[in-house]
Amino acid sequence: MTGFSNKAIVIDGRGHLLGRLAAVIAKVLLEGNKVVVVRCEQLNISGNFFRNKLKFMSFLRKRCNVNPARGPFHFRAPSKILWKTVRGMIPHKTERGKDALRRLRSYDGCPPPYDNRRRVVVPAALRVFCLKPGRKYCHVGRLSHEVGWKYREVVRKLEDKRKFKAVHKVAYERKLKKITKDAGAKVSKATAPFTAVIQSYGYN
């Protein structure tokens, strides 16, 4: 994930630890890259669910006594929780930090056009690499749902629909590939002289 690119890096959030992924994203954003994170509801947090919920409920009690509408603002959606975590790792009050934060997009589920884009993972932030087997962890989606996020079922339905379409698309592409291969084999004898001429010019 080194080097500058105008094309956005699409990260699949599933199975990553929230803080470690946010640290990597913050660094990449400050280098000038664009980052898109999908499936934020499947991010993980180390520690058992009960402790993490207590921490979040404590955070919900933080407010301005004079006028609570001034903030702090308590985001419930997993995509916004990731966004705010990244913001805390960026000098977001400077112009450089503001520009970096504008290059970040985070989504719950995997909306178009990113469902057809190649998605990457960050090995340094994967839970299976970072936590010892048997250590407790929880999902950001579950935490969000229990503190007021209303769209867990909607995102689940859309994800099921997307996965169903993806399976059928792969099956169709395999079938098409096989048909094309069989058709090529059938006409290979008839096209042999032409193929020889093409290959003599260095084309395969």
UniProtKB/Swiss-Prot annotation:
GO terms for molecular function: mRNA binding; structural constituent of ribosome. One of its GO terms (cellular component) is cytosolic large ribosomal subunit. Transmembrane segments: none annotated. It comes from the Eukaryota. The keyword Ribosomal protein applies. It holds the Pfam family Ribosomal_L13. GO terms for biological process: negative regulation of translation; translation. InterPro entries: Ribosomal_uL13 (IPR005822), Ribosomal_uL13_euk/arc (IPR005755), Ribosomal_uL13_sf (IPR036899). Keywords: Ribonucleoprotein, Ribosomal protein. Belongs to the universal ribosomal protein uL13 family. This is Large ribosomal subunit protein uL13. It comes from Choristoneura parallela (Spotted fireworm moth). The lineage of its organism: Eukaryota, Metazoa, Ecdysozoa, Arthropoda, Hexapoda.
